């Protein structure tokens, strides 16, 4: 038995399922999860001392690579001055100014401690600003585990085969309308049936919680137009796409200006940070300037702000955005080419520094229904084969994977060499 397996058994005695977030349990792929001891650059090292090329990146935050020296020193320096004050700091101003510089639609910003907190707060704000109760999301998209959002949710809920969660009252869920991603007609139908009642649309601009699904041409433009016509706010949930799809997020990549944006993951440089922000007139409704209450003991934590500030300043250096997208495209194209070589039907999607692949003979995968038609069992087999070859992909067919600036030619080439061997095994098994 490996040390990871031993630790997993031990963890289950005191931690539900042995993990502190469900997807980590490997339920989506089977087997025992790896317990990680340390990480550096593009590599993670498990409790047994084995190294893996990492394409999970702590589920997205590690865009510069693991254990980056500059971020590490920023954390140490901040920690030496105190871990938490519960009072304003100058670094919070610097951080807000930097985020607003990179994402201009965020004229004002409120820092929080997680992506879930950010989306939950943004939706409360949208309801308070518009005076409406209903919200619209998309099937297969995931916006955190707030009660009103666990309605046909993606990510962990899809991985576990549970489209909604027990414990969410029907009275909460009834205010959440669910449309079809990449289908504007479904959006229009819901607005027509709920005239003057919908406060906002919240959307992952690239759906990263049913693997990786970009918008079809005109989808986001259509959402913007519909929201303007109906007096609803458009919320881009950029917890995953922010600073990763492009330096200015998916909204910069697709040239769309949302009313509100939520951020997480990359913004903290590996520390627990989230944020929401947008038009000043909307953000002025947040307490203490407005009536919509939102608060947090650790919001704007000085150590977390220092990590995020260091991360974003490094990330915005010239050439980094293009370099990240280029190496991710190289990897995605390589997966597609190798699958074709071995006669394995595969759809590969990639935007900026995120990518995903689907074992399917469909020409495209553009919505949740398409995802459900993919070969999940084949994904599980491929995942474990790649793991055996030293490559750590997201342990779920419903999760996107991520590259970092620390992934160089050596890591990309080694990954594709492993994929070549793994596709060959799968092709042989299918004969």
Curated annotation (Swiss-Prot):
Keywords: Cytoplasm, Isomerase, Porphyrin biosynthesis, Pyridoxal phosphate
One Gene Ontology biological process: protoporphyrinogen IX biosynthetic process
Substrates-to-products reaction catalysed: (S)-4-amino-5-oxopentanoate = 5-aminolevulinate
Modified residues annotated as N6-(pyridoxal phosphate)lysine in this record: 265
Keyword field contains Hydrolase: no
Disulfide bonds: none
Subunit architecture: Homodimer.
Family of this protein: Belongs to the class-III pyridoxal-phosphate-dependent aminotransferase family. HemL subfamily.
Protein's UniProt name: Glutamate-1-semialdehyde 2,1-aminomutase
Organism expressing this protein natively: Vibrio parahaemolyticus serotype O3:K6 (strain RIMD 2210633)
């Amino acid at each position: 038995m490996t040390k990871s397996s031993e630790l997993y058994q031990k963890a289950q005695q005191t931690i539900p399922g042995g993990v502190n977030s469900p997807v980590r349990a490997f339920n989506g792929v089977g087997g025992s999860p790896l317990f990680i001891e340390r990480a550096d650059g593009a590599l993670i090292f498990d409790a047994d001392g084995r190294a893996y090329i990492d394409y999970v990146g702590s589920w997205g935050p590690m865009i510069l690579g693991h254990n980056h020296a500059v971020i590490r020193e920023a954390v140490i320096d901040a920690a030496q001055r105190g871990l938490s004050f519960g009072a304003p700091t100058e670094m919070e101003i610097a951080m807000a100014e930097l985020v607003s510089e990179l994402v201009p639609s965020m004229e004002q910003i409120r820092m929080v401690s997680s992506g879930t907190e950010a989306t939950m707060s943004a939706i409360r704000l949208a309801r308070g600003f518009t005076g409406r109760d209903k919200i619209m999301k998309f099937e297969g998209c995931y916006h955190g585990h707030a009660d009103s959002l666990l309605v046909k949710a993606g990510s962990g809920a899809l991985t576990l085969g549970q489209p909604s969660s027990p414990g969410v009252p029907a009275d909460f869920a009834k205010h959440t309308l669910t449309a079809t991603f990449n289908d504007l007609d479904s959006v229009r139908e819901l607005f027509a049936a709920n005239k003057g009642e919908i406060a906002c649309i919240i959307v992952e601009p690239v759906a990263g919680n049913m693997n990786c699904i970009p918008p079809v041409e005109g989808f986001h433009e259509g959402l913007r137009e519909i929201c303007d016509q109906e007096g609803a706010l458009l919320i881009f949930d950029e917890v995953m796409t922010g600073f990763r799809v492009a330096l200015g997020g998916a909204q910069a990549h697709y040239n769309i200006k949302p009313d509100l944006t939520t951020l997480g993951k990359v913004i903290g440089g590996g520390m627990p940070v989230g944020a929401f922000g947008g038009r000043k007139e909307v953000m002025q409704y947040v307490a203490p300037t407005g009536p919509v209450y939102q608060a947090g003991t650790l919001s704007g934590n000085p150590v977390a702000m220092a990590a995020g500030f260091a991360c974003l300043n490094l990330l915005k250096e010239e050439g980094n955005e293009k370099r990240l997208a280029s190496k991710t495209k190289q990897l995605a194209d390589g997966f597609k080419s190798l699958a074709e070589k071995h006669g394995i039907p595969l759809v590969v999607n990639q935007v900026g520094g995120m990518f995903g692949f689907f074992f399917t003979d469909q020409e495209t995968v553009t919505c949740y229904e398409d995802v459900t038609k993919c070969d999940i069992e084949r994904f599980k087999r491929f995942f474990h084969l790649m793991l055996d070859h030293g490559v750590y992909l997201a342990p779920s067919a419903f999760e996107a994977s991520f590259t970092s600036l620390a992934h160089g030619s050596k890591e990309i080439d080694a990954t594709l060499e492993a994929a070549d061997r793994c596709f060959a095994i799968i092709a042989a098994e299918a004969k």
